[in-house]
Regions:
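Intrinsic-disorder/low-complexity signal
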Residues: 1-221
Length: 221
């Protein structure tokens, strides 16, 4: 059974068998907004673009690497987005610009796959975060999305999870109402093992740049 993540909660990365969890996915599943028009006789689908990202830090809190959508153009102010970490331990499946159009299909729209065995030795922590992108269709907050959740699971990106280890339901959390960015949690090294700490801090950030700066400043150690 998946752990419903709460702020400040820490979990051990272990399978039900007791073996260490080293290969897993961090995914986000969300739905587009269905608006009824003309007294309910027709509908309009509002595309919702969420962006799942992560940043990697060394023990001193310096940025080592990052993953965020290559579609972001920061005009040289921040590194260009990319889908793979330099050590190829983490991979992003690509940017979903719309959300589920026909209801929840049980699959995540964006996924970052993680292989802890390949993470560079100088990476001490990995912070995962989520943003709402201001597209022409939707510029609201998490509470306006029909469903949105982040989860850690064992499996592959294109199939239902074998086992869900932890889940955070973003759209239903009262602390996420009125917010547009979420710092989900942090993987970190402790005594030679990897641990996971749920953060669950939500913010009103209007752009991913604000969140990137915030994560580097407040969550790097």
């Amino acid at each position: 059974m998946a752990i419903r993540l709460e702020k400040g909660q820490r979990i051990n990365l272990e399978k039900e068998s007791g073996t260490k969890l080293t290969n897993f996915c961090v995914g986000c599943n969300w739905g587009a907004i269905i608006e009824k028009k003309f007294f309910g006789l027709s509908t309009h689908v509002v595309d919702v673009d969420l962006d799942l990202s992560c940043m990697m830090f060394d023990a001193a809190g310096n940025v080592v690497d990052h993953i965020w959508s290559p579609l972001y153009n920061f005009r040289g102010k921040l590194p260009q987005g990319k889908l793979d970490s330099n050590d190829h331990a983490l991979h992003h499946t690509g940017d979903d610009l719309t959300g589920d159009q026909n209801g929840d299909d049980g699959l995540d729209n964006e996924i970052i796959t993680v292989d802890l065995n390949r993470v560079s030795s100088n990476v001490n922590s990995i912070v995962f975060f989520l943003n709402i992108y201001n597209n022409s269709e939707y510029s609201g907050d998490f509470s306006g999305i029909p469903y949105a959740s982040i989860r850690m699971f064992e499996g592959t990106p294109n199939r239902p999870p074998k086992q869900v280890f932890a889940q955070y339901n973003v759209a239903t959390k009262t602390e996420c109402a009125g917010k547009r960015a979420l710092v989900m949690g942090k993987l970190y090294r402790r005594n030679g093992d990897w641990k996971f700490a749920a953060i669950g801090d939500a913010f009103e950030d209007r752009t991913i740049v604000e969140t990137i700066v915030r994560v580097a400043r407040d969550y790097s150690k």
